[in-house]
From Swiss-Prot:
One GO CC term, this protein: nucleoplasm
DNA-binding residues (ranges): 18-144
SMART domains, alphabetized: PAX
The UniProt record lists the keyword Transcription regulation: yes
Subcellular location(s) of the protein: Nucleus
Coiled coil: none
Lineage per the UniProt record: Eukaryota, Metazoa, Chordata, Craniata, Vertebrata
Known role: Probable transcription factor. Involved in kidney development, acting synergistically with lhx1/lim-1 to establish the pronephric primordium in late gastrulae/early neurulae.
InterPro entries, per the entry: Homeodomain-like_sf, PAIRED_DNA-bd_dom, Paired_dom, Pax2_C, PAX_fam, WH-like_DNA-bd_sf
Protein name in the entry: Paired box protein Pax-8
Keyword vocabulary terms for this entry: Developmental protein, DNA-binding, Nucleus, Paired box, Segmentation polarity protein, Transcription, Transcription regulation
Sequence segments annotated as region (RED subdomain): 96-144
Region annotation (PAI subdomain) ranges: 21-77
């Protein structure tokens, strides 16, 4: 703060007439110059003696504002030295002060800035005028003290004892990567089993071949409809979209369409009348007695058929000898049985109604009926499955199909709540197994025959 006082005492001859003058109290002053150190000290002494500021101003011929400012600064900081208003303070971050702050911080890294300030004053490194503020100490710690910890390698080596050495990080061998060896990670399945994993080139080749096979399968489905490329957006790249489409276009079930590009398996075209003749011949060959229908696993062939407008496209695939394709409706013994080729006038190869292996559980009855009365697979204690539209079963016949057990009884119900209702509220038969609601569909209209219903006839 620049204190321009108008109460300078002294002979007028010592003042510059051009820059000075007399104040209202008759005291001489100089513009732009602070009050002399002697006058400042006299103001403080009179204040300690108990003289009022107004009396000090009259005695020393110094303005009242100057006396008040000097005394206020003295009571606050203990200093009577003049400052500069609006100017910069004298540099407090001297090399000596910075070194001391660094020493304190190294001795106690958790020391606060105000503790460092108090210690500087206590040890006499700084006085009240030269001690840095708390913000200045924090700035010194950030900019200067922390730079001492980031010393170059040469200075660090010089500070080490003769028995200590520094090893650069580049000289340390990093631990072996889990994917760096040919057997993969030690803790992975491939590593435990000793399976060699393909390298990056091998994986890239596999991915390329996989994508190529996916493209072939996508191209072969020309009748699938609108191309998926129309659904693409510019937010995705070309390769991620191809990979996603490849996984979605894969068929998880046996292929049910004919293709001219896929010539891996033999295909034959059978018309609907020819297939119906083969079905009729197959039904006529079945008898109502226990007939053992053998099979030859080495020559077993499975077929998958798809109904279109006027023709059946049946894809013939050679299946493995261990796979067993069986139809529950074509079994008459507990063993898995398939149909042999049928010798008839029309040269139609043998076929099974289902191309995929069907696992049948439970026990099969030895009762084989002709026509529609074909008994399917049943589970112990459960009613048999009767397709819709086949309601020619009597309650006694159905009761005979169900395995005997303690869960079901053929006797009439004698419960009081059941007997409370009239006969019109109950089923015609008092037995649960003879209920037409569950096991007879004669009173209901049969749905129109479909292609799947034609296979149920076998």
């Amino acid at each position: 703060e620049l204190i321009t006082e108008r109460g300078c005492s002294g002979p007028a001859s010592n003042l510059n007439i051009g820059h000075g003058g007399l104040n209202q109290l008759g005291g001489a002053f100089v513009n732009g110059r602070p009050l002399p150190e002697v006058v400042r000290q006299r103001i403080v002494d009179l204040a300690h003696q108990g003289v009022r500021p107004c009396d000090i101003s009259r005695q020393l011929r110094v303005s009242h504002g100057c006396v008040s400012k000097i005394l206020g600064r003295y009571y606050e900081t203990g200093s009577i030295r003049p400052g500069v208003i609006g100017g910069s303070k004298p540099k407090v971050a001297t090399p000596k002060v910075v070194e001391k702050i660094g020493d304190y911080k190294r001795q106690n890294p958790t020391m606060f800035a105000w503790e460092i300030r108090d210690r500087l004053l206590a040890e006499g490194v700084c006085d009240n005028d030269t001690v840095p503020s708390v913000s200045s100490i924090n700035r010194i710690i950030r900019t200067k003290v922390q730079q001492l910890f980031n010393l170059p390698m040469e200075s660090c080596v010089k500070s080490l004892s003769p028995g200590q050495t520094l090893i650069p990080s580049s000289a340390v061998t990093p631990p072996e990567s889990p994917h760096s060896d040919s057997l993969g990670s030690t803790y992975s399945i491939s590593g435990l089993l000793g399976i060699t994993q393909p390298g990056a080139d091998g994986k890239r080749k596999l991915d390329d071949s996989d994508q190529e096979s996916c493209r072939l399968s996508i191209d072969s489905q020309g009748s699938m409809g609108i191309s998926r490329k129309q659904l693409r957006t510019e937010a995705y790249g070309h390769h991620p979209l191809d990979a996603l489409e490849c996984h979605f276009q894969r068929q998880h079930f046996p292929e049910s369409y004919s293709s001219s590009t896929h010539s891996k398996t033999e295909q034959a075209l059978y018309t609907l009348p020819l297939l119906n003749n083969a079905m009729d011949d197959g039904k006529s060959s079945l008898t109502s007695t226990n007939t053992t229908i053998g099979r030859n696993l080495s020559t077993h062939q499975g077929y998958s058929a798809l109904s279109e407008l006027s023709a059946f496209t049946i894809k013939q695939e050679a299946s493995d000898s261990s796979s067993a394709s069986s139809t529950p409706s074509s079994l008459c013994s507990p063993t898995f049985l398939d149909l042999q080729p049928i010798s008839s006038g029309c040269s139609a190869p043998s076929f099974s109604a289902f191309s995929h292996p069907a696992s049948v559980y439970g026990q099969f009855t030895s009762h084989m009926a002709s026509g529609r009365d074909v008994v399917g697979s049943t589970l112990p204690g459960y009613p048999p499955h009767i397709p819709s539209g086949q309601g020619n079963y009597a309650s006694s016949a159905i009761a005979g199909m169900v395995a005997a057990g303690g869960d079901y009884s053929g006797n009439a119900y004698s419960h009081g709540a059941y007997a409370a209702y009239g006969e019109s509220w109950r089923f015609p038969s008092s037995s649960l197994l003879g209920s037409p609601y569950y096991y007879s569909s004669a009173t209901r209209t049969a749905p129109p025959p479909t292609t799947a219903g034609a296979y149920d006839l076998l």
